[in-house]
Amino acid sequence: MEYRYSYVIDPSSYDNQGLCNGIPLRVHRNADIEEYATISLRNDWRKHVGPLPLTSYGGNLGPKYNFTAVTLPECRPDRLEIVSYIMEFAFLHDDLVDTAQVDEALALNDTWRDGITEGLDTTSAKGKKSGEGLILRNILKEVTAIDPVRAAELMKFWKRDLDVSRDRKHFRDFDDYMEYRIVDCASYFLIALSTFAMALTIPAEDKDEVFTLLTRPVWAAAALTNDVQSWEKEDKLFQKDNATDMTNGVWMLMKQYSIGVEEAKRRILGKAREHVAEFVKTLSQIHNRLDLSLDSRLFVEAMQYMISGNLMWGISTPRYHSDQSLDEMMVARMKYGWPNHREVTKLTSDLENRGTKRTHQDDTEGVQSVKRFNGASTKNGINGTNGINGLNGINGSNGVKIKRHKNKEYSGALTKDSDLVLNMDLNGLSSAIICAPADYIGSLPSKGIRDNVADALSIWLDVPAKELNQIKRAINLLHNASLMLDDVQDGSVLRRAQPTTHTVFGPAQTINSAGHQIIQAMNEIRKLGSDDCLDIFSEELEKLYVGQSHDLYWVYNDSCSPTIEDYFKMVDYKTGGLFNMLARLMTAKSSSSSSPDLTALVGLLGRYFQIRDDYMNLTSADYTVEKGFCEDLDEGKFSITLLHALSAAPEPEALLLRNLMSGRRNDGKLSVVQKNLALSIIEGARSLEYTAAVLQKLYKAIVRELESTERQFGENKPFRFLLSLLKV
């Protein structure tokens, strides 16, 4: 997985109690968004429903980690606010159900389930139900506006989760309890919320295995860990209500085996560790599961943070631990809203002077409605059709658009505040602006070919997982940078069926972001700690630029068409360069005693990939949807198909074709009629047949090279499967 929105926490800085060994802890870079959304939901609850449930202290928030930020660290930034808002809503619902009597709890579930199914009619609902219904309807409206397809899936799974009978207290034994608990821990809800948060599409044929089998250990481990962490809270409620049974694994083992609390906890945590170890094994194998879609594999990988994130949030959350408290800034934000810059400075100073300490009572007091946050107005905690408006400048359905602040208090601030003028210790600039174009193109659907190639080559090279991920991230950063630059240089308007980056952010910002991506790629390579890897990166990157220069030169000087040999040299540098860089870097970091020479294999693959792309551009209906009808003709690209047509067509047709390609300069593109004329000349010269024959020849050569390598280093099923996907 390419991590774009989160950073990893140094494992030496926290104690995971052996409950997530082999799984890192990551935190979303925009964790403040979750805090804002959580406080907004709690304000909306007070306004529309009434006082918060007595057990609702903390919710998403924690003194060290916020729940969504660590369980969904790769949530898209433009969806983090609504996802966090939903998560807090679910926490409050759980609190209501936990403290309600059986009949009332079932009624609450029915209210929510009906609201999700039909959309609550708030004019007929009363009291508490009406308020919850209003918030729920706003949530449904918001997620549907952002992503209607995944929103429908979210609602379906959320309803499925609520269908679980929440009043069940009696189980045959611990195993019977676990079958119930895996669903009761909101696995259906969290599965769907995760796919929505990361904009993943899981094919129907993958769902049973991915949702039910592969990730089952995740929900088992999370449920058991939660049972231990929440024991004190649940036991207090149990004793307060004079109950005779409770839904908790610790209690189940105590009853079944007549053991004490501490022994039951010890056994529960032991079982949790077993489930974690099982899932770590799944993670080690998932990259080779090319029978699953890329999104399915990404989903499975992302679910590891449901284990580590849930654990580390749960260790310190005030929700479970009454001796824990939120930090002072969270206290202030809950009590006073989100002040502007000057108010933050004053408030922080006041808090430091008073030594304010967080108490449970602070959270149950009324909180002022949040009116402004960094210059953005809010309503029901959410503003903007597709996500965040004004928070760190993020706004938009498919990317990030920076909004200028309109707070009049800033006018003349520099001239009024001499201390600020002379202050050389200002906070650094946010990278949100420069990363926005790259984040946008990274969010578009991708086949993940380069990741698949890396996973396949690792069968032979056995690159350690950490270093393999760093190499893959560097390659993906370079690939996305090249796509942004290519689209600017070619004047493309579509990329993967969406507007190209420069048509959203403008050429200047796009070029700047692409350069930043290249620097980030270099930083990833530097982390490998190898001078050889830096040399490989530099050498292959230079080839990429040289190859692109020839392609651009031929387009600009369209009378100077290249030879077939020149074309192949360009492809080897431009397209083959990334594949070659990938193979060389992986070879340099291989832990195998001997490594294959992959030069010919990846070189042939690079040629095949480029020629296939050119061929599909002229013949594939899918490419027409993703990039436009025969877009290469608009760009004036000299593909092998066009070069053959110019040399094989009768002179009058060849001259006509050349004039069409030159004439595209007038409007920057060809009309549909002109493209059809060009296609008729290309087809008349049998250039498409020629291209198909070249592809077939290359494919056979790749297979021969693969078989030769397999004879020395073993069978490589993932590479064969990848080839079958690319075969024309």
From Swiss-Prot:
GO terms for molecular function: geranylgeranyl diphosphate synthase activity; lyase activity; metal ion binding. The keyword Isomerase does not apply. Dimethylallyl diphosphate binds at R495, K574, T575, Q610, N617, K627, K637. Mg(2+) 1 binds at D94, D98. InterPro entries: Isoprenoid_synthase_dom_sf, Polyprenyl_synt, Polyprenyl_synt_CS. Isopentenyl diphosphate binds at K447, R450, H479, R496. Disulfide bonds: none annotated. SUPFAM superfamilies: Terpenoid synthases. Residues 352-379 are annotated as: Disordered. It catalyses: isopentenyl diphosphate + (2E,6E)-farnesyl diphosphate = (2E,6E,10E)-geranylgeranyl diphosphate + diphosphate. A motif (NSE/DTE) lies at residues 226-234. A motif (DDXXD 2) lies at residues 486-490. Residues 328-728 are annotated as: Prenyltransferase. Residues 381-398 are annotated as: 3 X 6 AA approximate tandem repeats. Mg(2+) 3 binds at D486, D490. Pathway: Secondary metabolite biosynthesis; terpenoid biosynthesis. A motif (DDXXD 1) lies at residues 94-98. Keywords: Isoprene biosynthesis, Lyase, Magnesium, Metal-binding, Multifunctional enzyme, Repeat, Transferase. One of its GO terms (biological process) is terpenoid biosynthetic process. Hexamer. This is Phomopsene synthase.
